[in-house]
Amino acid sequence: MNSFLFSLACSLLVAIPAISAQDEDAGGAGDETSEGEDTTGSDETPSTGGGGDGGNEETITAGNEDCWSKRPGWKLPDNLLTKTEFTSVDECRKMCEESAVEPSCYILQINTETNECYRNNEGDVTWSSLQYDQPNVVQWHLHACSK
């Protein structure tokens, strides 16, 4: 019985990404949006691959020539983030894209009341700490993508 459950779980790990890829190829909206709102209210955990390590990530073609996706209401605890000096989303995104500092910058979290910008301080984010539906916070995720 255990080997059957293991086989079933492995099959799902292969089938689910393939189905998601078919949805994207067919013009499906997906869960993440660029510059727009999250259209599904999704609570799925994002991939832990860093945006700065393109060799370990699938290439994503962004629909609006942008390599960022927006997650309103997503919040990581302060101990997983480092505050930056930037106060605008554009400046913060540019800093992240051009950063050569380790770990690679691929998660930005913006406090929309204070306009404070935070970035991931670890290479692998602890997604189990992620909180959803939090007020006054927006996360931006940088993807390895082609324009």
Curated annotation (Swiss-Prot):
Q: Sorted alphabetically, which Gene3D superfamilies does this protein's record hold? A: Hepatocyte Growth Factor (3.50.4.10)
Acidic residues bias located where? Answer: 22-41
Return the annotated region ranges for Disordered. 21-71
Its signal peptide is 1-21
Post-translational modification note: The N-terminus is blocked.
Q: Where in the cell is it found?
A: Secreted
Record keywords, A-Z: Disulfide bond, Hemostasis impairing toxin, Platelet aggregation inhibiting toxin, Secreted, Signal, Toxin
A single Gene Ontology MF term assigned here is: toxin activity
What is the tissue localization of expression for this protein? Expressed by salivary glands.
Keyword Repeat tagged: no
Mostly located where? secreted
Q: Does the keyword Signal apply?
A: yes
| Disulphide-bonded residues | C67-C145, C92-C117, C96-C105
Q: This protein is called what?
A: Leech anti-platelet protein
Organism the protein comes from? Haementeria officinalis
The record lists the lineage as: Eukaryota, Metazoa, Spiralia, Lophotrochozoa, Annelida
